Amino acid sequence: MIKFDNKLEIRYSFNDKSAYMDAWIKHRCEKEILSMLRVLADLLDVKMTAHCEPFSQEGGYRVVWPIAGESTRSISVVLNILMQVLTRPTLSVGGQPLVDRTNSDEENMQKEISLLKRSLKLKQAGALIPRELVELLASWPKFCKYKSNFYEALRGYPKVTKINVRELNENNRSRSGSLEVKREQFDYFILRSDDLPTIKDNKATIEIISPVLKDSRYRWKGIYNKGGETIDFYMCDEDFKKQMFDEKISFTSGMCIDCVLEIARKLSELGETINISYTVTTVIRTRFDKLEIVTPQGKRHLRKLEAEKKQLTLDLFG
């Protein structure tokens, strides 16, 4: 007999007194929440399985998922993070992201996850869920997409007026406060676009496989040093292309460029980040074997970076 010390409850409130719900909407919503639950459990290395429990209710619709696993406390932590992330808006009133995600946010999130995971493994009593971790997870693109899919499905189903989530114990008594999101707030969770901010790699190195000098519509091919993957990229450094066309720089097999690389990204339906295009804006230097040549535009770029660094130092200590 499986013991269920933890349960997750989702209540859908309706604009009428019925107790039925569109099956397609219900299953689409459940898919997004279960996906978030699985990702959180994997991130924190918590072994758990979710089950379905029948529950009757007059007016509205109630879903209860009994959760089984090795640690009641760890499961409770996962459920509480899930509830906070699910009910924390992604966008402002104007439709802009509440948080501008940066690379340091990704690093901090992984650091906070590691600390909480360690705390759970050591079974430290009274370990709190860091607020910073909840905020970082709530703005994580993967979870933003899950939330967007969830609330977009409900927005298209006018019958639902609000949702509530809470954790229950084995006797279906509340283990946590109930968190609520009303219909008029749904838009604050729905992404306006799947496009993500372009990231800039100022220290990219690409081994050129095949250049294209005559037609800017075609992409170059090279091996990107981050992960060693082969990429197709646009060369938008016109000075560099002219230098190669005029044979001031000659292409040789094995030639590498250190450059500024812009990477355009978007979210997939599953919340995965996909790189959709690569663009080299500035070639800083060329390298072949032990020979390195800094380009004129590369010198200008390096001087600009140095000036910005000095200005930042003055601002900090001035």
What are these regions (language model features)?
Residues 1-201, 211:
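Charged, alpha-helical interface segments at or near domain boundaries
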Residues 14-16, 210-212, 261-267:
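Beta-strand elements of well-folded, non-transmembrane domains
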Residues 199-216, 220:
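Structural detector for short beta-strands of small beta-barrel domains
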Residues 206, 249-273:
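Flexible glycine-rich surface loops and low-complexity tracts that mediate binding to linear polymers
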Residues 221-226:
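Short, acidic/hydrophobic/Gly-rich beta-strand patch recurrent on exposed beta strands
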Residues 228-250:
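Beta-strand/loop nucleic-acid-binding surfaces
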Residues 264-299:
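OB-fold/S1-family single-stranded nucleic acid-binding modules
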Residues 288-318:
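Extended, charge-rich, solvent-exposed interface segments
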